[in-house]
Amino acid sequence: EDFKTDMDCAVSIERRIAAMKQVYAAGIRTVCFVSPVFPGLTDFEAIFARVKNQCDLFWLENLNLRGGFKKTIMDYIAVKHPGLRPLYNQIYNRHDRSYFEALMRQAEAMARQYDCPFVDNEMPYGRVPQGHPIIVNYFYHEEIRGSENTGARHKKEDK
């Protein structure tokens, strides 16, 4: 909650989860969009445990740092979470994808553990059995932009 407050002025996480539960109970398809996943800070498995019985889709998107926003976040990490500076340097200055590749494998394993579908850049519609939301990988947004959620990615080697 403290981290959320540092990042935005929206209502509390508890209020968001309570609202999601009410909407889900009313029969409306719900999505838990975990975005951005901050390396070393966002525990998406803990979030999943809290919401899996009240959402149909569980989206994951990594933190993308572009433009002036990069300096703002890197400065925030340096001040508030200095122990994470090497990790953020590895990811955002050295362009090492291994952290998020490992998180993707972790999300796939979580999907298997909870018998949930795992899709890459897709937008499935409809309700799912309670407790088995579809886990959607939206890591590396720059690769999926313009793909219309078809599952296609535009990797550097594809260009």
Report each predicted region and the residues it spans.
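C-terminal accessory extensions appended to soluble enzyme cores
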Residues: K70-K159
